[in-house]
Curated annotation (Swiss-Prot):
The RuvA-RuvB-RuvC complex processes Holliday junction (HJ) DNA during genetic recombination and DNA repair, while the RuvA-RuvB complex plays an important role in the rescue of blocked DNA replication forks via replication fork reversal (RFR). RuvA specifically binds to HJ cruciform DNA, conferring on it an open structure. The RuvB hexamer acts as an ATP-dependent pump, pulling dsDNA into and through the RuvAB complex. HJ branch migration allows RuvC to scan DNA until it finds its consensus sequence, where it cleaves and resolves the cruciform DNA. Residues 1-64 are annotated as: Domain I. Residues 65-143 are annotated as: Domain II. SUPFAM superfamilies: DNA helicase RuvA subunit, C-terminal domain, Nucleic acid-binding proteins, RuvA domain 2-like. It comes from Ralstonia pickettii (strain 12J). The gene is ruvA. Keywords: Cytoplasm, DNA damage, DNA recombination, DNA repair, DNA-binding. Residues 151-193 are annotated as: Domain III. Homotetramer. Forms an RuvA(8)-RuvB(12)-Holliday junction (HJ) complex. HJ DNA is sandwiched between 2 RuvA tetramers; dsDNA enters through RuvA and exits via RuvB. An RuvB hexamer assembles on each DNA strand where it exits the tetramer. Each RuvB hexamer is contacted by two RuvA subunits (via domain III) on 2 adjacent RuvB subunits; this complex drives branch migration. In the full resolvosome a probable DNA-RuvA(4)-RuvB(12)-RuvC(2) complex forms which resolves the HJ. Residues 144-151 are annotated as: Flexible linker. One of its GO terms (molecular function) is four-way junction DNA binding. The lineage of its organism: Bacteria, Pseudomonadati, Pseudomonadota, Betaproteobacteria, Burkholderiales. This is Holliday junction branch migration complex subunit RuvA.
Length: 193
C-alpha cells in the first residue's frame, strides 16, 4: 500500500493532482481542504495517501494531514459511502467541523454537502458517533482547532461529560484561552446547564 507520496507537483486541476516521484507520475485525488493548501506547480509536495484497489482501477487519494486521512478511512467504512462522497464531506467541512456535527447530531450541516441527503446524513451521524470527537487531539497533524481546546475537550470527557455536553461547553470558551482557564469556563458553562 502507498501511504505517502513526496515529489514535484506537476499538475493541479481540482480535485485531481499529478505528482512526479522520481520519474513516475502519480494521479491523486484530494479534498478541497488539501487542494487549497498545495504549493505552486513545480514545487515539492508531500501528501499522506490512501490507496483503494478496485476490480477496474487502482486509485490514490491524498491528504495534507493525518486527521483528514483517518477521517476519510472512517467515512469509507460506512455502507453506501464511497471515496467520492468521503472527499465531498472533507471538501465541505473540516475534520473539526465534522466531529462537531457528529457530536451535536446536526444532520442539517451534512445535508448542505452535495451528494448527501437526509438518510445518508443520518447514517453518517450514527456510524461516526464516538469515532471522531474524542480522538481529535490524538491524531498527529490534527484538525484546525487549538491544542488547548482539544485538551479542554479531553479533560471534560475524562470527567465523565458526554461528547455533546463537552462540545457545547467548548463553544463557550473564547479562542486563545489557556487549558486551566478553559476548563474552568467550560465547567462553569456546564453548571449553568
Amino acid at each position: 500500500m502507498i501511504g505517502r507520496i513526496a515529489g514535484t507537483l506537476i499538475e493541479k486541476n481540482p480535485p485531481h493532482l499529478l505528482v512526479d516521484c522520481h520519474g513516475v507520475g502519480y494521479e491523486i485525488d484530494v479534498p478541497m481542504s488539501t487542494f487549497y493548501n498545495l504549493p505552486a506547480t513545480g514545487e515539492k509536495v508531500v501528501l499522506l495517501t490512501q490507496q483503494i484497489v478496485r476490480e477496474d482501477a487502482h486509485l490514490l487519494y491524498g491528504f495534507g494531514t493525518a486527521a483528514e486521512r483517518e477521517t476519510f478511512r472512517q467515512l469509507i467504512k460506512i455502507s453506501g459511502i464511497g471515496a467520492r462522497i468521503a472527499l465531498a464531506v472533507l471538501s465541505g467541512m473540516s475534520v473539526a467541523e465534522l466531529a462537531q456535527a457528529v457530536t451535536l447530531q446536526e444532520a442539517g450541516r451534512l445535508t448542505r454537502i452535495p451528494g448527501i441527503g437526509k438518510k445518508t446524513a443520518e447514517r453518517l451521524l450514527l456510524e461516526l458517533k464516538g469515532k471522531l470527537g474524542a480522538d481529535l487531539g490524538t491524531v498527529p497533524g490534527g484538525p484546525a482547532v487549538s491544542d488547548d481546546a482539544v485538551d479542554v475537550l479531553n479533560a471534560l470527557l475524562a470527567l465523565g461529560y458526554s461528547d455533546k455536553e463537552a462540545a457545547l461547553a467548548i463553544k463557550q470558551v473564547p479562542a486563545g484561552t489557556g487549558v486551566s482557564e478553559g476548563i474552568k469556563l467550560a465547567l462553569k458553562a456546564l453548571s449553568k446547564g
